[in-house]
Swiss-Prot record:
Region named Basic motif: 393-402
TM region(s), chain numbering: none
Chain residue ranges for the region called Leucine-zipper: 407-414
Matches recorded under SUPFAM superfamilies: Leucine zipper domain
bZIP domain segment(s): 391-454
Gene (name only): bzpD
Domain of life, per lineage: Eukaryota
Function: Probable transcriptional regulator.
Organism, as annotated: Dictyostelium discoideum (Social amoeba)
InterPro entries xrefs: bZIP (IPR004827), bZIP_sf (IPR046347)
Protein's name according to its UniProt entry: Probable basic-leucine zipper transcription factor D
Bias (Polar residues): 90-111, 550-595
Biological processes, Gene Ontology terms: regulation of gene expression
Coiled coil ranges: 211-246
Ranges for region Disordered: 83-160, 378-405, 455-504, 550-712
Length: 834
């Protein structure tokens, strides 16, 4: 069955218009007029029509009447429920809402109400239906009072709902920014009641005593007056703004409507649209007049029909009041009671009407851009202000500082963690090492007991080795003693002289002092010698130098300079030493040379540690010296014997040295013998020395000499054998030492000391001279010193020469002693250059 929608809409509009008229007539109309005027100023047309505040009468019933019949017989049950706060600021857009449009001050995307019509054929059969508290039961227009009375009588005490309206709880929210305005909020219902009767059980008695109504009206008026005073103050402030806003919105709406776009409803004709536009224009001219034209500001309604499968659901109409934060659903139930006859039956249809909410109107180009989904380019103008740059730099510094602080904290944290880890590792290692130490100590104690026996055995072995070594040393010593005994047997004549050498140092020191006196006298009183004269011209006997020891020629410029031994007549063989002869007759000159340590070279026997120079003076002096006595003959015989013994001893020593090499200190402990010969032949006798690594500066002085005897220089035995040497009284020794008044018998040490001597480190030379050679045997015998004396001199040696006396008669010797030149007849005279 088709429904006449135009008639039904007209009925609703007339009912709304009558509501406003009744509000103006009663005492509550003053406040409602103001609210109604505000509602007409809204930009949403449908919202202005259906969101007006509901004014309740004194009996809490709606005064809607049409042809003396009540349209709505139920009460508005208003409940300020806080649970509906989640519905605030719900800006959900409708299908016809303009995209990307922000809600205005009075328009927050509130959906348009829904008009739902129910078929009442099934309502009588349903006895237990849940009725919302905020639902409005709409009875049929032709229903009479009898049906209402029956429904009231059939309703139980539980179905009867008293007036729950509290005027103080009204919240007037016409103005969005002000929550203090008392406005009746139509919220969604929460409390539901079950009825045992049909839909007529939801109706409430409309008849209330007139006295009660008057009292309620007076109370409402008093409360409304207080509220009006507050509203007037707020509305006066914002009324001007609202009017301007509404005027601008209306103009934009007119410009945005394109006549080419079909905005008409399928159920509405062109006349309805024209009426809407006319009503919109009338609101802009006279918004506050409560005329009938303002009541017909109908919105553009589009209705859609849903499927009939939802026939069991109640048809409802959503009536949304003028509250931007809440949405209330008002269900209008329509019951057809035509005198108990269900003559009019209508199908259940749902009409979903949505209204386009115009909030922020856009131009055609903007709408096309939005429809095309083109991105909007926003240009941000660059700022070149110094303040902005400073702020940016400041922020960068702050960011860097924070980053650095964070990094430092992280590093510190990591460092601390590493330290803790190392500490834990070290403690673990320490504990493990302690355990190992204890274990090793136990092993040491165990092994100590086991090794005690082995140590004792090793000590015994060492003692046995020491005993064997001592035995070997004793055997060697016995061999040496045997050699000494053999030497003693061969040299019986020299026993007396060896015993005299073992005198104490004090006696030697006294003899040295005495000889020093005589030697100095002889040196100072010696006359100068010419190149053509000899000592024989001065004294009754001739004296001439025989050797110039440790001198070098001027022609040698190479770094390796060899030592030469010069004499007036004879030189050594080529195989013995590298020598360079010197002219026999030279003037007294001084030459300064450096003597290296390798001045002497032995080409024949380089591996031997002993240098043996045996000069055998076996020449007979019978042709030259006929006046020699028996003493000279005896001396020759003794010299020959000594030479033979020395050769034998040297051969034995070489063999022992090859078998048992001794230390360097033993090898260097040597001395030189100077043997006088009675022969008249002349020869050279070099002194041999082991020089050190250093050099000394020497000067050679030559004098005119006569033909002396050639001494025989031979190497003596070691120091161990020197203690009791078998030397003849005629033999002479050169003994030297590094420190004064200490006599040395080592020829190697003597030679090195001679070469290394300088002004800061002078050398001390001690001469062990026989008394007979100095003709002092009588004086020495008178003193009781023996046949020999010692001369000790501390000096820097630059040149050494050995003077050998000529063979003279004993008679002449006694007369020469007091002479000034008697010291020149000494067996060995050292001339020193200071």
């Amino acid at each position: 069955m088709d429904i006449d929608y135009e008639n039904e809409i007209s009925i609703v509009l007339e009912a709304k218009h009558n509501q406003h008229l009744n509000n103006n007539n009663n005492g509550c109309g003053n406040a409602n007029n103001i609210n109604n005027e505000n509602n007409f100023l809204q930009d949403d047309l449908v919202y202005n029509f259906l969101s007006d505040e509901v004014t309740l009468g004194s009996d809490c019933t709606t005064p809607y009447t049409l042809n003396n019949n009540h349209i709505v017989n139920s009460n508005y049950i208003i409940n300020n429920n806080n649970n509906n706060n989640n519905m605030l600021n719900d800006h959900s857009s409708s299908p016809m809402r303009v995209p990307n449009s922000s809600p205005s001050l009075y328009n927050n995307s509130i959906e348009s109400p829904e008009l739902v019509y129910h078929d009442n054929s099934n309502n009588n059969n349903n006895n237990n239906n849940n009725i919302n508290v905020n639902d409005i039961n709409v009875n049929d227009i032709n229903s009479n009072s009898t049906n209402n009375n029956e429904s009231n009588n059939n309703s139980s005490s539980e179905g009867e709902l008293p007036c729950l309206v509290d005027i103080q709880q009204y919240q007037y929210q016409d103005m969005l920014p002000f929550d203090q305005q008392p406005v009746v909020v139509m919220q969604n219902p929460i409390i539901t009641t079950t009825t045992t009767t049909t839909t007529t059980t939801a109706t409430i008695e409309q008849q209330i005593n007139p006295s009660e109504q008057q009292q309620q009206q007076q109370q409402q008026q008093q409360q409304q007056q207080q509220q009006q005073q507050q509203q007037q103050q707020q509305q006066q402030q914002h009324q001007h703004l609202l009017q301007e806003h509404q005027h601008v919105v209306n103009e934009e709406v007119l410009h945005m409507i394109d006549p080419s776009v079909d905005l008409t409803n399928t159920y509405m004709d062109a006349a309805g649209i024209s009426d809407i536009i006319a009503s919109d224009s009338s609101t802009t001219t006279s918004p506050s007049s409560p005329s009938t034209s303002n009541m017909f500001l109908t919105p553009m309604v589009t209705t859609t029909t849903t499927s009939e499968t939802s026939s069991s659901s109640d048809s409802s109409v959503n009536i949304i009041p003028n509250n931007t934060n809440t949405i209330t659903n008002i269900l209008i139930k329509e019951e057809d009671t035509n005198n108990g006859n269900n003559n009019k039956k209508s199908k259940k249809r749902t009409i979903d009407s949505r209204v386009q909410n115009i909030v922020h109107p856009l131009t055609r180009e903007e709408l096309l851009k939005i429809a095309g989904k083109e991105p909007v380019q926003v240009v941000d103008p660059p700022t070149h202000n110094q303040e902005d740059e400073r702020n940016v730099k400041k922020q960068r510094r702050l960011i860097k500082n924070r980053e650095s602080a964070q990094l430092s904290r992280m590093r510190k944290k990591i460092y601390i963690e590493d330290l803790e880890k190392t500490i834990s590792d070290l403690t673990q290692d320490n504990s493990s090492l302690k355990e190992e130490v204890l274990y090793l100590q136990g092993l040491v104690k165990q092994l100590a007991a086991q090794n005690s026996n082995s140590n004792n055995n090793s000590v015994i072995d060492i003692n046995n080795n020491n005993v064997n070594n001592s035995q070997q040393q004793q055997q060697q010593h016995q061999q040496q003693q045997q050699l000494n005994n053999s030497n003693n047997n061969n040299n019986n004549n020299n026993n007396n002289s060896t015993n005299k050498q073992q005198q104490s140092k004090n006696v030697k020191a006294a003899g040295v002092c005495l000889l020093l006196i005589f030697f100095s006298l002889g040196v100072f009183f010696q006359p100068p010698q010419s190149s053509t004269q000899r000592f024989g011209a001065i004294t009754s006997f001739d004296v001439k130098p025989t050797h110039s020891i440790l001198s070098m020629s001027d022609s040698e410029s190479s770094p390796q300079k060899s030592l030469r031994l010069s004499s007036n007549h004879h030189s050594l063989p080529d195989g013995t030493f590298n020598t360079i002869p010197i002219d026999q007759q030279t003037t007294a000159t001084t030459n300064t040379k450096s003597l290296p340590s390798y001045v002497l070279n032995n080409n024949d026997d380089s591996d031997s540690d002993y240098e043996n120079v045996n000069i055998n003076n076996n020449n007979n002096n019978n042709n030259n010296n006929n006046n020699n006595n028996n003493n000279n003959n005896n001396n020759n015989n003794n010299n020959n014997n000594n030479n033979n013994n020395n050769n034998n001893n040297n051969n034995i020593k070489r063999k022992q040295h090859q078998q048992n090499p001794q230390s360097d200190s033993f090898q260097n402990r040597k001395k030189i013998k100077i043997n006088l010969a009675t022969e008249n032949t002349e020869g050279d006798g070099p002194l041999v020395s082991k020089s050190s690594a250093t050099t000394t500066t020497t000067t050679t002085t030559t004098t005119t000499t006569s033909t002396p005897k050639t001494p025989q220089i031979s190497e003596d035995v070691s120091i161990d054998e020197i203690e009791e040497p078998m030397v003849h009284s005629s033999q002479q020794y050169i003994v030297c030492s590094d420190s004064p008044r200490i006599v040395s018998n080592n020829i190697t040490q003597t030679t090195e000391s001679l070469l290394n001597s300088n002004s800061t480190n002078p050398i001390t030379i001690g001469l062990l001279l026989p008394a007979e050679s100095l003709n002092l045997h009588n004086i020495v015998n008178n003193i009781g010193g023996g046949e020999r004396s010692i001369l000790e001199i501390s000096c820097q040696v630059s040149n050494i020469r050995v003077w050998n006396p000529l063979s003279i008669d004993i008679d002449h010797q006694s007369s020469i002693v007091p002479a000034s030149s008697s010291s020149s007849s000494a067996s060995s005279i050292f001339t020193n250059h200071f």
